[in-house]
A protein has these predicted regions:
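Bacterial signal peptide processing site
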Residues: 16-20
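Conserved serine/cysteine hydrolase catalytic core
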Residues: 176-251
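Catalytic active-site module of serine/aspartate enzymes centered on a nucleophile-bearing elbow/loop
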Residues: 244-246, 252-280
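N-terminal cap/lid segment of alpha/beta-hydrolase-fold proteins
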Residues: 24-42
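Flexible "cap/lid" loop of the alpha/beta hydrolase fold
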Residues: 149-187, 224
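Active-site loop/oxyanion-hole signature of alpha/beta-hydrolase fold enzymes
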Residues: 84-125
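Conserved hydrolase catalytic core segment
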Residues: 120-157
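Conserved HGGG/HGGXW glycine-rich cap/lid loop of the alpha/beta-hydrolase fold
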Residues: 39-92
């Protein structure tokens, strides 16, 4: 993989990434919707549906949350409460303080949920960078999280392991592409996030976990990238090992943005984890 092909595929890697059978335990009957102050900046959250646990949707880097989860959220709302929010600097949320690391993002999400009155238990569904944030949130608040769905999630070892596959030029172009996003997240922020998540993963709780993986290979310009695909699969398997019984499910017809390509697969995974969480 060389030149433009390397840049194209790795810019993609920066992006995102019927009713249930068991009756839903009762949750708040008036879901919040609006902007709440989080450490001096407004953050938007909107919840739909009723029931527990509450599903919290986490989007990829610089990706609009509404479009990412457009087909997923209404389907999930039919069997439990589901909340979508805009990270600081995105859509209806105001920019937050620097640096923009996973630690900062998850702290803001936790504070936002508290301000909005969205109480645990939670099931987290995180796409791409949102999957990394979900890993950190669950590790830092294990008593509040009852399940996790990782949607083609990033992994804290991706950055250091992928660069040798690219060569000097490809690695440089990748860093530039990753630093160009609507959230103001820098490449340095992403490396710091890797360290934060890597250090926290040992505390990931033993909860139901499904790691969804894209099934359509990255082939920018028609050029296959088997080395990247092999690494990606290894990292998804490692993500699944965060929890006993965690497993990888391949979305055969999807590129990186599985929630947009195969929303039914994402909804099915969330439903399964919610059902398991209710049985715990």
């Amino acid at each position: 993989m060389r030149g433009r092909a390397a840049l194209a595929v790795l810019a993609v890697l920066a992006g995102c990434g019927g009713d249930a059978g068991t009756p839903a335990p009762k949750a708040a009957s008036t879901p919040p919707a609006g902007t709440f102050d989080v450490d001096g900046h407004g953050m938007f959250i909107e919840c739909k549906g009723d029931g527990a646990p509450t599903v919290v949707l986490e989007s990829g880097l610089g990706v609009d949350s509404t479009s990412t989860w457009a087909a997923v959220r209404p389907a999930v709302a039919r069997f439990t409460r589901v909340c979508l929010y805009d990270r600081a600097g995105m859509a209806a949320s105001e920019p937050g303080p620097k640096p923009r690391t996973s630690e900062a993002m998850t702290a803001e999400l936790h504070a936002l949920l508290g301000k909005a009155g969205v109480k645990p238990p939670y099931v987290l569904a995180g796409a791409s960078l949102g999957g990394m944030n979900a890993q950190l949130f669950a590790s830092e608040h294990p008593g509040e999280v009852k399940g996790v769905v990782l949607v083609d999630s990033l992994h804290p070892d991706l950055d250091r392991r992928i660069e040798p596959l690219l060569g000097r030029r490809g690695a440089r172009e990748r860093r530039q592409a990753l630093g160009q996003n609507a959230e103001g997240v820098t490449y340095t922020d992403l490396l710091a996030s890797d360290e934060q998540v890597r250090a926290a993963r040992a505390d990931f709780p033993p909860v139901p976990l499904i790691a969804l993986e894209h099934g359509i290979s990255f082939e920018p310009g028609g050029e296959p990238v088997p080395s990247v695909e092999k690494l990606w699969g290894e990292l998804q398997a490692d993500n699944a090992r965060l929890s006993p019984g965690g497993r990888v499910v391949v979305a055969a017809k999807s590129h990186h943005r599985i929630a947009e390509d195969e929303p039914d697969v994402v909804v099915g995974a969330i439903r399964k984890v919610v059902e398991q969480a209710r049985g715990r």
